[in-house]
């Protein structure tokens, strides 16, 4: 536990050093960095205190339940104090690091994008704009693929999504989600439960939290994800 805390705090110190260096020359532009949902190694509630806006990279696997992605969006909203967050990265097509890097189905990226907005995202962004020519990310999806044209299905779908977001999104930017139910997600518990000897080495903390979240998601119940000792948990009856 001591090492886990040290690791998270040390990397946070690296981020704040870089942030402060930028602040010497730019006092107004919001500063953030890419978070990764339920990533184990960093206590994101502590990180969010040092970020002007929370942003994260959403890369669900081919077998990731939509409810788990929804939980991650709500977690990112929760660590930022229920404020709108940024969907910093998603791919308009395939990822390049999964065991099976499937091509997104027609309309899939639209569903994922609006899911993010529905859970509090004020931005929908992509990585990457133009497909890399070298390195492993030459296999990663992009708005503009290796053919360099606007004729691909992916480009046309992404462009249509952009027009849709521009038309509708302006009406809902900055809006807040009101929830009457809260679920605690605590990195200290995450580390201790998965690091202890017994009762099982197969315990997966995010999956256990998701079991409760999924039951609410299936009933269309909005959920706030909160930390231990959350100051405003009295606002939620459950």
Give residue ranges: language-model regions.
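Conserved N-terminal glycine/acidic-rich loop preference
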Residues: 1, 8-15, 40-53
């Amino acid at each position: 536990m001591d090492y886990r805390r040290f690791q998270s705090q040390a990397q946070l110190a690296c981020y704040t050093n870089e942030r402060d260096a930028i602040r010497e020359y730019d006092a107004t532009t919001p500063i953030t960095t890419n978070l990764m949902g339920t990533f184990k190694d960093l206590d994101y509630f502590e990180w969010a205190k040092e970020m002007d806006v929370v942003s994260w990279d959403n890369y669900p696997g081919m077998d990731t339940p939509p409810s788990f992605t929804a939980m991650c969006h709500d977690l990112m909203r929760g660590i930022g104090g229920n404020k709108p967050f940024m969907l910093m990265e998603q791919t308009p097509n395939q990822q390049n690091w999964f065991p099976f890097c499937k091509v997104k189905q027609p309309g899939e990226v639209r569903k994922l994008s609006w899911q993010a907005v529905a859970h509090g995202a004020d931005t929908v962004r992509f990585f990457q704009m133009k497909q890399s020519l070298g390195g492993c990310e030459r296999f990663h999806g992009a708005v503009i693929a290796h053919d360099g044209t606007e004729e691909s299905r992916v480009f046309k779908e992404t462009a249509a999504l952009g027009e849709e977001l521009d038309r509708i999104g302006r009406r809902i930017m900055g809006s807040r989600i009101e929830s009457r139910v809260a679920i605690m997600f605590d990195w200290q518990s995450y580390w201790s439960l998965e690091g202890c000897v017994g009762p099982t080495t197969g315990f997966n903390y995010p999956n256990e939290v998701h079991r409760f979240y999924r039951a609410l998601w299936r009933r269309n119940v909005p959920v706030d994800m909160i930390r231990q000792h959350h100051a405003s948990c009295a606002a939620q009856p459950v």
